[in-house]
Amino acid sequence: MNKQIFVLYFNIFLIFLGIGLVIPVLPVYLKDLGLTGSDLGLLVAAFALSQMIISPFGGTLADKLGKKLIICIGLILFSVSEFMFAVGHNFSVLMLSRVIGGMSAGMVMPGVTGLIADVSPSHQKAKNFGYMSAIINSGFILGPGIGGFMAEVSHRMPFYFAGALGILAFIMSVVLIHDPKKSTTSGFQKLEPQLLTKINWKVFITPAILTLVLAFGLSAFETLYSLYTSYKVNYSPKDISIAITGGGIFGALFQIYFFDKFMKYFSELTFIAWSLIYSVIVLVLLVIADGYWTIMVISFAVFIGFDMIRPAITNYFSNIAGDRQGFAGGLNSTFTSMGNFIGPLIAGALFDVHIEAPIYMAIGVSLAGVVIVLIEKQHRAKLKQQDL
């Protein structure tokens, strides 16, 4: 493997491992500081909004100033963010930490993505980006597991460790990464109005709404899961890490071994509808359950459902896009980011009203998603009849 690509993969792995490390300890951290579910929602939303705003500028700056420089700046910001969270004793410091963390993600991701494109031979780009996606998922899966066991020592230790990982990634990047003489450009391109008029916007309206609704519901549940289980069955950070890591592993296995097989027998819309119905049933069981192992097993099942929905939506967007793959990908990303921003805000406020309220909201949103899928299926059927 190319040395630079290995370092880029390692950087991405460390970043997402660092993000995952802190998830199991948040309930203990919030209780320690006397913060609420609404506060957690604001912290998560601040990260998402900051990343959403900075990402396009990060891509443009990477093209103008060099991707290595932007990656290194992003890694330093990541470490600063984690260390601030580790020493923070009031909400304003934690909020500033999350904003800086979002900025770091908005710089590292475009820089790494662009540099992988630069140093990859054309016939290996798809494979290398596939590896990047797998490495991101690995960081998310392993992070909570490691963080939960670190929290047995101190609930602030995962944040210090994540900050140290950022410094390690920064040093490796300075020493081992080099900007290529010829590079791709992934920043803003000149907007040509005539291109927008050629796009059949009606094709994308319902899928975009579906993406927003599902991102809203999924992010709402995932943001409050650790706090929810901590309050309901007194899960410790180690328990939360087992649930999230176990669910992530099972979800990844289902994606690898079963997703392609399902796609041979179901259309994306049909598969999404059944996955949503499955998720509703499992979420209802989560509300009813009150035992340690019952909730642990149900948690595994919940994350499997969510991990199957996401690639199906991405696949559907790609299939309807035709020669507008870039536009469809951007639309998918934009509406996903909007859902990831709005969902935690509302879920956090609802949690303070009743701990089950975010689960009820996720159930309602999933049912709304089923209705949207049925509407989209009818629309697609009419379009096919018109083409005949």
UniProtKB/Swiss-Prot annotation:
Gene3D superfamilies: MFS general substrate transporter like domains. Belongs to the major facilitator superfamily. TCR/Tet family. The chain crosses the membrane at residues 5-25, 42-62, 69-89, 99-119, 129-149, 157-177, 201-221, 239-259, 269-289, 293-313, 331-351, 355-375. Signal peptide: none annotated. One of its GO terms (molecular function) is xenobiotic transmembrane transporter activity. The gene is norA. SUPFAM superfamilies: MFS general substrate transporter. It is found in: Cell membrane. Disulfide bonds: none annotated. Keywords: Cell membrane, Membrane, Transmembrane, Transmembrane helix, Transport. It is a multi-pass membrane protein. This is Quinolone resistance protein NorA. CDD domains: MFS_MdtG_SLC18_like. Involved in quinolone resistance. May constitute a membrane-associated active efflux pump of hydrophilic quinolones. InterPro entries: MFS (IPR011701), MFS_dom (IPR020846), MFS_Efflux_Transporters (IPR050189), MFS_trans_sf (IPR036259), Multidrug-R (IPR004734), Tet-R_TetA/multi-R_MdtG-like (IPR001958). One of its GO terms (cellular component) is plasma membrane. Its main location: membrane. The lineage of its organism: Bacteria, Bacillati, Bacillota, Bacilli, Bacillales. It comes from Staphylococcus aureus (strain MRSA252).
